Amino acid sequence: DHCLGLVLDALDASPHKDNTIVVLFSDHGFHLGEKQRWARRTSWEDGDRVALIVAAPGYKSGNKTNKPAQLLDIFPTLLELADLPRDNQQEGHSLVPLLMNSQAEWPHVSLSSFGKGNYAVRSEHFRYISYLDGSEEFYDHRDDSHEWNNQVGNKKYVQEIAAHRKYLPVRSEDVLPGNSTGHKAYDAASRLLKE
């Protein structure tokens, strides 16, 4: 924090403070024993979520939002902030609407994966996880922000679960041969680690 403060203080004292965009983001989160897990290696919120701060001239500072975003959204955001043409092959979405109004309508989701065939879809209120073995998890963050109660079998969420499933890839291929992590897998049905 101190070193970042030094950089920002130097920027404020420079002639470039009014034409510089600052983007700060982190690596993924980390489990500290929750659900019998250490390190990241899951698709739950604590292991998936990253901090993201964007400060740009002409935009009010201090706005916060819980709308889902992904790191793919940074490049289109920078293009729009710099008034440069958008590349239509980009997968991300500009976050400028959220910089203007943190509560703006935001129909986009955040997609993530961990290991072959394991995917998470995060919308504003829900997280859906699909595992290679066919098991699923679904959490309502409005009343279960720590994702303790899997709602995948709850008929109340049938439509939301179906809507989230539509974001899953149609195929899954290894990026690296075999299991590149060397760590135990998580069995959602038993809520235990397996070899």
Regions found by a protein language model. Give the residues of each.
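Aromatic- and histidine-enriched alpha-helix N-cap/loop-to-helix transition segments
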Residues: 2, 69-70
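Alpha-helical packing segments of well-folded alpha/beta enzyme cores
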Residues: 2-7, 164, 168
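Histidine-centered active-site microenvironments of extracellular/periplasmic hydrolases
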Residues: 9-63, 70
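Secondary-structure boundary motif
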Residues: 13-16, 104, 153
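C-terminal cap/loop subdomain of S1 sulfatases and analogous C-terminal strand-loop tails that border
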Residues: 28-34, 60, 72-146, 159-160, ...
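Short, solvent-exposed loop/turn segments at secondary-structure boundaries
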Residues: 63-67, 85, 152-153
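Active-site-proximal N-terminal segment of extracellular/periplasmic enzymes that hydrolyze or transfer
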Residues: 149-157
